[in-house]
């Protein structure tokens, strides 16, 4: 009898809690509007995270979802001339192929439109702004994101976002922490609107050295710590060597490490070639990743795909794939399938052209 009474009390307590919860939810919806709170696994499950390709197949695979996540903040940092802007221009070109509107906030006033065009960027459809102050730059970013019509915004770079107080002051005046405060406020304002509009914002950043560090890495990024916390993905890009044609340097060997990733496992690394005037070498990646995935067979110096030999040496194999885009697409499709990825857009013959 006592046990029955205890169960009845428990049931009554649960019913009271459920009633209180329903009242609280109803009050929240009255105050903030329908959809302001809901069950995560309800009638409308959360949508899958969309991704924009980086232009590098290896990096798309390393990021785990086939590219950089939409509706998130991304930070790309590294030393000078390591390929940061090149990588973001490839992202813009890939997003434009899908019909998205892209904007480039050029705080460094250093964008080369001819180079951007060579990487596949449609200059007619690219919005560009060259702001005078950091406040102006971030206000422009906020307005573009809130419009809901822009898919991708690139800020180049955080280090060049100079606070108004610093510009109006004299050379040598101390404005300690002004840039960090500016970035911290911008992150707080941007985060919610970025999520609602499903717009990706990429911040390019530079490396600085911390003074007096005895242990650990002395490197840090400019603009304070706010961006590190708010970014869903952080990429560390480095130049590891030079690519030579006889005695002439024609490009860089580049390594990218996924330092932070909120949408897939982090700390993956990938290497690819960046050729001067051409960008990321797609056919070079197909050869290297094809061998790793077992799609392309390598015996001595010879590369073969199925029963067909595609070249003796890496350069000859690359040339074969340039001349035979259909086979290149087959290889790419199989590499993507082996990692659970699919083509985002139908590729064109121009994607493999490297002059």
Swiss-Prot record:
ATP binds at residues 78-85. SUPFAM superfamilies: P-loop containing nucleoside triphosphate hydrolases (SSF52540), RecA protein, C-terminal domain (SSF54752). The keyword Mitochondrion does not apply. SMART domains: AAA. HAMAP family: RecA. Belongs to the RecA family. PANTHER family: MITOCHONDRIAL DNA REPAIR PROTEIN RECA HOMOLOG-RELATED (PTHR45900:SF1), RECA (PTHR45900). This is Protein RecA. It comes from Rhodobacter capsulatus.
């Amino acid at each position: 009898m006592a046990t029955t009474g205890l169960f009845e009390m428990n049931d009554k307590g649960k019913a009271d809690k459920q009633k209180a919860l329903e009242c609280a939810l109803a009050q929240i919806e009255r105050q903030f509007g329908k959809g302001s709170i809901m069950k995560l696994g309800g009638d409308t499950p959360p949508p899958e995270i969309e991704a924009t390709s980086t232009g590098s197949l290896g990096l798309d695979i390393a990021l785990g979802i086939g590219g950089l996540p939409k509706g998130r903040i991304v930070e790309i940092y590294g030393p000078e001339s390591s390929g940061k802007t090149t990588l973001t221009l490839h992202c813009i070109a890939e997003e434009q192929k899908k019909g998205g509107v892209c904007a480039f906030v050029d705080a460094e006033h250093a964008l080369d439109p001819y180079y951007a065009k060579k990487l596949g960027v449609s200059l007619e459809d690219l919005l560009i702004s060259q702001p005078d102050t950091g406040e102006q730059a971030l206000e422009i970013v906020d307005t573009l994101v809130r419009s809901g019509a822009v898919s991708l915004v690139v800020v180049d770079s955080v280090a060049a976002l100079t606070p108004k107080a610093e510009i109006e002051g004299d050379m040598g005046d101390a404005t300690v922490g002004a840039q960090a405060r500016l970035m911290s406020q911008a992150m707080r304002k941007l985060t919610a609107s970025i999520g609602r509009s499903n717009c990706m914002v990429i911040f390019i950043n530079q490396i600085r050295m911390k003074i007096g560090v005895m242990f650990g890495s002395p490197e840090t990024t400019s603009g304070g710590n706010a961006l590190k916390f708010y970014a869903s993905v952080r990429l560390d890009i480095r130049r590891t060597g030079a690519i030579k044609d006889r005695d002439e340097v024609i490009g860089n060997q580049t390594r990218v490490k996924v330092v932070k990733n909120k949408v897939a496992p982090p700390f993956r690394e990938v290497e690819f070639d960046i050729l001067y005037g051409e960008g990321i070498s797609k056919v070079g990646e197909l050869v290297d990743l094809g061998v790793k995935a077992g799609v392309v067979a390598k015996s001595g110096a010879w590369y073969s795909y199925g029963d067909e030999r595609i070249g003796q040496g890496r350069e000859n194999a690359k040339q074969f794939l340039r001349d035979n885009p259909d086979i290149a697409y087959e290889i790419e499709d199989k590499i993507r399938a082996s990692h659970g990825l699919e083509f985002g857009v139908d590729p064109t013959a121009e994607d493999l052209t490297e002059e």
